[in-house]
Amino acid sequence: MSLVDLGKKLLEAARAGQDDEVRILMANGAPFTTDWLGTSPLHLAAQYGHFSTTEVLLRAGVSRDARTKVDRTPLHMAASEGHANIVEVLLKHGADVNAKDMLKMTALHWATEHNHQEVVELLIKYGADVHTQSKFCKTAFDISIDNGNEDLAEILQIAMQNQINTNPESPDTVTIHAATPQFIIGPGGVVNLTDETGVSAVQFGNSSTSVLATLAALAEASAPLSNSSETPVVATEEVVTAESVDGAIQQVVSSGGQQVITIVTDGIQLGNLHSIPTSGMGQPIIVTMPDGQQVLTVPATDIAEETVISEEPPAKRQCMEIIESRVECAEIEEREALQKQLDEANREAQKYRQQLLKKEQEAEAYRQKLEAMTRIQTNKEAV
């Protein structure tokens, strides 16, 4: 049996999941060949869900990232069909989790397209990039939304947030450059974290006010920076425990002698403060508002001055970038569609030329046949 025949039989055995036949053929020297589409034995085993055959081929040294004519890898095949166990064994053997096919789609795209939640979770676990866009400018999250799969959309959204959140510090922070009493401002009130006897809070009322007014009240409520260790701040309202602080209040972050107060204001109206002991504050406070503005407040003893620095919100910038990216992708798709139509027209023209040539050859053969018959008839008549 020739090597070509051995290679063909290996492809058939891998497609059928015949482990013993695969071993025998490889022992007899069957090459790791492919079919006319570039499909290898490992592609077929992964596509048809033959786990043990996949392991046999991987141990034998078949390329784990082999490509078909459309650049699909065995991982693409397994993910598209929902074979989670084969996806995992391929990844354990070092398959490229972010490999892209001709449509620039990864295994995560295909698993999402076919609603294979277990495979999606497995790919994310092994480091699949959830932000990768296909040739059609679609992420896996976009595909899940298009398919109406809310469970997958939630999983992918969480994964996207986890991969983006590389900076642990919140952008909406207030930094005080001194060893001041530590406060948290949230919907539950202004909480003093330095009181050894407990955590004291000043409750907010129901009337609406700005974050700036709240910070001014905080400046009055806090002790002087130079004497912060001597005079703890205690509000005139009720004393609460740390467990009663609202869960939405962010934690104070200390770094390099700085205290960072994070104010949670999205969707919450802060009310007027109740009675608070008045005392000075020796340092200004810089607040980054949720809409991207930065406001500088100074103590009441200094000249009151506000400096508002407006900048484009990050969300708006990101939205504009997405829109520009999609417009660019749409233009690329249009050019590619036109090129595809041109190529198709050229192929049709070539096809008609070949058909015409064939007809001409047939006509010539028929003419010669008629001439031969005429000569034979003439000879008979002459005799």
Curated annotation (Swiss-Prot):
N6-acetyllysine PTM sites in chain numbering: K69, K340, K369
Keyword Chloroplast: no
A Pfam family matched in the record: Ank_2
GO biological process: mitochondrion organization; positive regulation of transcription by RNA polymerase II
GO cellular component, one term: cytoplasmic ribonucleoprotein granule
GO molecular function: transcription cis-regulatory region binding
Residues recorded as bearing N-acetylserine in the entry: S2
Posttranslational modification: Acetylated by EP300/p300. Deacetylated by SIRT7, promoting heterotetramerization and activity.
Subunit structure: Heterotetramer of two alpha and two beta subunits. Interacts with HCFC1, causing repression of transcriptional activity.
Annotated protein name in UniProt: GA-binding protein subunit beta-1
Protein's organism: Mus musculus (Mouse)
